[in-house]
Amino acid sequence: FDILHFLTNSLVASLIGSALAIALAFPAAYAMARFNVGRAWLLPLVVNLRAVPLIIFAIPIYLMYQQVGLLDTRFGLALILALVNVPLVLVLLASSIADLPIEIEEAGRVDGAGTLRLLAYVVAPMSLNVVAASSVLAFIYSWNEFLFGLIMTTNKATPVSVGASFFFAASGGGVRWGVAAAVMILATLPPLVIGLVMYRQIGRSMTAGAVKG
């Protein structure tokens, strides 16, 4: 088994999936926080989707992927990872944007800035800590995703969460525990390193809005 191949698959799919989750959730979070679009019903619905067992979506997604040729592809896996992480990212971003001082945006509107310009040049810079924390959490959840990695991939796009389990399969001489342990350590390094590098942003995002000045 090629552990580097599995690591590369997970890295590419997790990065793309995390980026897509942020790109999808950020505008939606702004609309919910500032314009109350769907805040009363859509946000609770999206949050409650996290409680739904993902296995019920496996067969429909598999059949759809089979039709469009996304089975065993990194991009296909990344799409699923993005959709799985959107609820978490949406909740974090919406609560953070709601705590931002609206006076700065109002001043921007007085100067003639539109919604998209405010979103890009005012809201986004003030939300960098939460965006960074959300990206890290989305990356870690994507990296650890096992179910869809097992069902939707066979060889080319197999993630490390699935590939690592192959080393525990008994072969001629039984399980090689030394190799299996080394593989598991390698599999945990990327999210661990990213978490250590970004822990300050995660801490700041968790305390954002706790103190009103």
Model features per residue range: what roles?
Residues 1-213:
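A structural signal for multi-pass alpha-helical bundles of membrane permease subunits
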